A protein has these predicted regions:
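Conserved N-terminal/central alpha/beta ligand/cofactor-binding core
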Residues: 2-4, 10-20, 38, 44-45, ...
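Flavin (FAD/FMN)-binding glycine-rich loop and adjacent Rossmann-like elements that form
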Residues: 3-5, 10-13, 58, 140-141, ...
Length: 761
């Protein structure tokens, strides 16, 4: 091809491409991605505009921050709190493909998920720079430019979602926004920071290192800083930590975190290259002689800039008090996590985290602009105070919010293109909640009640159901850390529990029976009974009988005080909804075993009881009389797809070598779709990069199953499952009076389980 053009006195214009769509999403971070996929799967035509070459934002290979949310590195009391829906699907997929946490592979996981959706048009490397409005309060279109193909895109849509991080669409459209911290008097937030501490969170950039196996020299660039003089905490640098383990490499909280970003980047580069000079050339790290820099970030990962105003602003009290909202569509659970504005140049600790006792609801009213009729607010732009934002800002929470927005766009379309606020004012929030729950999106305190689900009218039987009568004693471990066996109990009397101990010397076994003061929480802040049992040296069984009663259906914590003279026997058996928790320390999330805040900051004091990551974290060997039986087949009708106040799962007996669940109807039913929900361990955080995981498939997940009709014909069969939700859309509907689901146990130590089965015509 040959092109030759003469002089054009009037100049030239770039190529222009028009798009007319139903939802335009600006921002391809995790929130934008989950918004797009959720909407697209419901039939909404989506244009997803991302100004970077890859998707994922701060989770991408350009920044390399791990994805976290309510699970908080398994360092808080939020059990089974990993976010559901599309973000769960992504994290489970990434763990399966990429358990080592390679950020480049995670890029590919996100790209795969997006391009698999025919209703999504993806525009990468495209920066939106202009908004056109048809009225003062209504956006008509946005313009973006892609420097890679020199093309201008004009995107028209009835609905827009700004998930851009800095809020370019909201800003250009004139929507009300805030930057900086509110005074404590405005919302009654006692944790509102002082100007001296700082009113903005800064940016971070990271670096990766590798050992080459041979000496490598390093000459720092001229712009590198002498960190021993410029960084007060320079001695924290070491040859072992890299990537987002250096989250405290933060700067910009005293600057304009939108318009000063390029200068902030240069300032962070000075620190990074200076830090590596210190590690390589100070002589303090001889192990660094053979190490080299493998990667340095080229764009900052942003924490905070603009926050936009919706019909409600989430605040500190919503999080700490776990306030309930009729329009709840998502939840959070990260700590309220403020950082000193001076960041890496501050002598203060890099963060100031305070946890709530459990997860909190996020209302729909926070997810759209109060000024611009057709603008959703996604990601870190949602309507929240600076203090509340310190919790909602993390990526898994932002993604969960994005899924609510994507589903809201579907509801708006189905109801003849409502505006976002109309979903609230015209009474469609229950429809929104219903559709979200169907996807596996957990909303605390809500359960799915689906009249179209044929299973709800069916009779259920199973070849067996697990009963927790005893766990075998496989090995013993000393009680070096206080440990609690979490057990799902009904209201009323507490069963007798027998444990097995090995006593090194005469001592006493200190036992407490605890539960939570709030239904659905897992903070054992209520002590029901205390026992002290004298024990002589030797191995023996100890029977615990309690006079206390459980006030309601909930998890009880059978807690054993730290005592190195005692070893408790453990089992290798793991069961859905049954686990141990430990009074552990996790400094990464400011968990020091107990949270003891100052009296005047509006936070609560409590102990942390957290599981250990596999392969650790074994259940205690115990005997229970009468046996616990919350694992029956009726659990698949509960409308909840994770443990809450009970396991909420059918669990087969371990000795059942061919577990089967049968669904029967009085009359034959025509079935086109079957939804199955398996246990992928919602307690496991599934950090997306760097950290790595011991498994690529979660220990509780059923790998192999088949579904047969009333004549024994196989309707569907799957081997090698690893996902939470399996949606089976049959090419031809099956007419049958029964379906039988036959499952294999995940392993010899884990019985098969199933949270839910749904069937639709």
């Amino acid at each position: 091809m040959k092109i030759q053009e003469g002089f054009a006195a009037e100049g030239r214009l770039p190529k222009v491409e028009l798009h007319h769509t139903e939802l335009a999403i600006i921002g391809g971070g995790l929130s934008g991605v989950c918004t797009a996929i959720t909407a697209a799967r419901k039939g909404v035509k989506v244009v997803l505009v991302q100004d970077r070459p890859v998707l994922g934002g701060n989770s991408s290979s350009e920044v390399r921050l791990w994805i976290l949310g309510a699970t908080s590195h398994l360092g808080n009391n939020n059990r089974w709190s990993r976010e559901g829906g599309v973000v769960d699907e992504i994290l489970v997929e990434n763990t399966y493909r990429n358990k080592e946490g390679n950020s480049l592979i995670f890029d590919a996981v996100l790209l795969d998920k997006v391009i698999a959706e025919p209703n999504i048009t993806l525009l990468l490397n495209t920066a939106v720079y202009e908004v056109d409005k048809k009225e003062d309060d209504t956006i008509a279109s946005v313009k973006g430019f892609c420097s890679q193909n020199s093309t201008e895109y004009i995107i028209h849509a009835p609905l827009f979602c700004d998930a851009s991080g800095d809020g370019i669409v909201g800003f250009l459209s004139g929507a009300a926004f805030r930057m900086g911290a509110e005074k404590k008097e405005e919302f009654g937030e006692k944790f509102a920071p002082t100007e001296e501490y700082g009113e903005l969170l800064g940016h971070s950039m990271y670096f990766y290192t590798k050992d080459t196996g041979r000496p490598v020299k390093y000459t720092a660039p001229a712009f590198a800083m002498d960190v021993s003089k410029g960084v007060p905490k320079f001695k924290k640098f070491n040859a072992k930590e890299h990537g987002c383990q250096l989250w405290w490499l933060e700067h910009g909280g005293r600057m304009d975190t939108v318009h000063d970003t390029e200068q902030i980047k240069w300032d962070l580069w000075k620190v990074i290259y200076g830090a590596w000079d210190y590690i390589k050339n100070s002589g303090n790290f001889p192990e660094a002689e053979t190490m080299t820099l493998e990667w340095v970030g080229t764009i900052p990962g942003k924490r905070e800039s603009r926050r936009f105003e919706g019909d409600y602003m989430l605040r500190q009290q919503d999080i700490v008090e776990q306030r309930e909202h009729d329009d709840a569509v998502a939840y959070g659970g990260w700590s309220i996590d403020l950082h000193p504005a001076d960041g890496v140049f501050s002598e203060k600790p890099g963060c100031n985290q305070w946890h709530a006792k459990g997860v909190y609801q996020i209302p729909y009213r926070c997810l759209y602009s109060k000024n611009i009729k057709n603008l959703f607010l996604g990601g870190r732009l949602i309507s929240a105070t600076h203090v509340a934002f310190a919790s909602t800002r993390v990526m898994a929470t932002a993604a969960h919010i994005g899924q609510a927005i994507g589903m809201a766009a579907y509801i708006a379309k189905e109801k003849q293109y409502l505006y976002p606020r109309d979903i609230l004012t015209k009474g469609f929030v229950p429809d929104l909640q219903h559709e979200l729950l169907k996807t596996g999106q957990h909303i605390p305190k809500l359960v799915l009640q689906d009249e179209k689900d044929l299973v709800q009218q069916a009779a259920l039987t199973a070849s067996s159901s697990f009963e927790l009568a005893a766990f075998d004693a496989d090995f013993a471990l000393p009680i070096d850390t206080a440990v609690a066996q979490m057990l799902p109990l009904e209201a009323g009397s507490v069963p007798d529990i027998t444990v097995e101990v090995d006593v090194k010397e005469d001592t006493s076994l200190q036992v407490e029976l605890r539960t939570s003061s709030r239904a659905g929480n897992y903070t054992p802040d209520v002590t029901l009974e205390i026992q002290s049992i004298p024990l002589a040296k030797g191995r023996r069984k100890v029977k615990l009988s309690f006079s206390a009663t459980m006030p309601e259906r909930a998890y009880a914590f059978l807690t054993f005080h730290k005592n190195s003279a005692l070893s408790l026997f453990r089992t290798r058996t793991r069961v859905t909804g049954i686990l141990t928790a430990f009074n552990l320390i996790n400094k990464a999330v400011s968990n020091f075993g107990k949270q003891t805040p100052p009296e005047d900051i509006g936070m609560e004091a409590f102990e942390f009881w957290c599981p250990q990551r596999r392969p650790d974290g074994h259940n205690l060997a115990l005997q229970i009389e009468p046996a616990l039986t919350p694992f029956g087949v009726e659990q698949i009708k509960t409308g909840v797809y994770r443990p809450t106040t009970a396991p909420n799962a059918w669990v087969a007996a371990m000795e059942d070598f061919a577990p089967q669940l049968k669904i029967s109807w009085e009359e034959p039913q025509k079935i086109r779709q079957i939804d199955l929900f398996f246990d992928t361990d919602y307690d496991h955080p599934m950090e997306s990069v760097l950290m790595g995981h011991p498994e690529d498939v979660m220990a509780f997940c059923v790998r192999n199953y088949k579904i047969v009709d009333d004549e024994g014909r196989v309707v569907f069969e799957k081997e090698g499952n690893y996902q939470s939700m399996n949606r089976i859309e049959l090419e031809e509907p099956v007419t049958t009076s029964a379906l039988t689901i036959i499952v294999d146990h995940p392993s010899a130590n884990v019985p098969a389980s199933l949270f839910s089965v749904r069937c639709y015509n």
